[in-house]
Every structure is written in C-alpha cells, then in structure tokens.
Amino acid sequence: YFLPQRQTKIMNEGWATYWHSKIMTTRALRDDEIIDYADAASGVTAMGPGQLNPYKIGVELYRHIEERWNRGQFGKDWEGCTDLHERLTWDKKLGLGKQKLFEVRRLHNDVTFLDEFFTEDFCRDQKFFTFKENRRTGRLEIEGRSFAKIKAQMLQQLSNFGQPFIFVADANYLNRGELLLGHRHEGGDLKADYARDTLRSLERVWRRPVSLLTILDDKPKRIRF
C-alpha cells in the first residue's frame, strides 16, 4: 500500500499544490485575500540548501511542463535549437499543457518524472545548486551549478527512497567474526555521526566489532566501532 505513495511523493504533493493554487487564486479567494494566501503557501513550498521539498519541486515542474507544451517547446526542432533568443521567444501556441499534465500524472513516478522533465532550462530558471557539507563547520555550502551534478544529486536522493545503499562485504572479517559493511558511494558522503551511531547499535546486536567502508571527502575511509 505504502510503496506507490513513496514512489510518487513529489508528483502527489506537487499535483495537490498545483490544483490548490489554481483553485484558490482563480475561484475561491477575493482580491484582498490573495496576499495572505500567498504568504501561507510560500511557507509550504520553501526549500533550504540541500533540501528536496516535494511540494516546491513538484508544483514548479508541473508548471514548467504545462508552459512547454502550451508553447510547443518539445520535439526535434526544439531540442535542436541552439539560438538563445529563439528559445526564449519560442511559442507555437499549441495549448497542449493540460493534456500533457494528465498524461505525465498517469504514466510517471518520481524518478522518471525528474529524469525526463528536469531540464537544464528548468534547473537554471529555478536557480538550483549542488551543496556539500563543510566538515569543519558542519554547514552545507554551495559546491557548484553543474546541471549534470545537480540532476544526479537529485535523482540520487530518490534512489532507495533517499537511504544509502549499505551491503555486507564480509560477515567474518579478518577471520575474527567481525562484520564488515560496504557503502555504495554514488556521489553523496554519509553523515559521519549518523554512521557511527548506526555502527554502535549494530555492534550491540552483532556482539563483535563492526566496520564500514565508505568514501569521505573523496578519500577511502573505514569507520569502526
């Protein structure tokens, strides 16, 4: 029951936000109520550094898709256009946005939704960045604006429902009954304090030392407890 909900969380929350905004601003509210509504809605869609807010990403991506298909910004001609001015003014007035939205809603999950429609234009318009934790201060800092890295980082957060891939490398490490785990590093470092707390709990269950092989700050690292 819960698996389909987890696989479409961004799509579900974005869809609800899209229609809630549409109904409230075009039908339900008086003009003097719009500002209060916008202030409340902005709190729901706020997104801090390194965060993935499903409401924000979902609704903005739906709006992006709607605009693209309304203006005919798809297909070989669009993909092959490299003239910036032509791309900015491109409008075939096709009006296919709503039709495309319902098609996307019917056919996609979060991973395919972002993989297909999270474009470089969308990334630039929404001012996305990649972030990395400064281990000295413990704060997230801007790492760059590479579209490929941004998209990969976002898709990685959706893989395995945002949890790291950990596997058993050796259940009798060094022939001493110790447990050796491996982390499938895909660009994002583990939180070292979380990893140590987890190993501490595993050690209580395993009753022998537990180690984890990972990569921190681009260097191989073995965490042991």
Predicted regions and their residues:
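A charge-rich, low-complexity, intrinsically flexible signal that marks solvent-exposed coils, linkers
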Residues: Q5-R6, I10
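Short helix/loop segments within enzyme catalytic domains
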Residues: I23-Y37
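Non-catalytic terminal regions of proteins
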Residues: D36-F225
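Secretory-pathway/luminal and periplasmic proteins that interact with or process carbohydrate-rich
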Residues: P4, T26, V44-G48
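An active-site-proximal "capping" alpha-helix that borders the catalytic cofactor pocket
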Residues: M11-M24
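Active-site-adjacent "gating/activation" loops or surface patches in catalytic cores
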Residues: Y1
